[in-house]
Amino acid sequence: MKRTYQPSVTRRKRTHGFRIRMKTKSGRAVLNARRAKGRKRLAV
């Protein structure tokens, strides 16, 4: 059986990267929430 997680740097960046988060209003909300919480890493 093939496992669910098949790592790929490209796909990782394209779906969870900083620039993608900045594109949408909700993505920016995610970043702001993480900033408010004091996360060391805002995005992948």
Curated annotation (Swiss-Prot):
GO terms for molecular function: structural constituent of ribosome. Belongs to the bacterial ribosomal protein bL34 family. It comes from Polynucleobacter asymbioticus (strain DSM 18221 / CIP 109841 / QLW-P1DMWA-1) (Polynucleobacter necessarius subsp. asymbioticus). This is Large ribosomal subunit protein bL34. The keyword Ribonucleoprotein applies. It comes from the Bacteria. InterPro entries: Ribosomal_bL34, Ribosomal_bL34_CS. GO terms for biological process: translation. Keywords: Ribonucleoprotein, Ribosomal protein. Gene3D superfamilies: 1.10.287.3980. GO terms for cellular component: ribonucleoprotein complex; ribosome. The lineage of its organism: Bacteria, Pseudomonadati, Pseudomonadota, Betaproteobacteria, Burkholderiales.
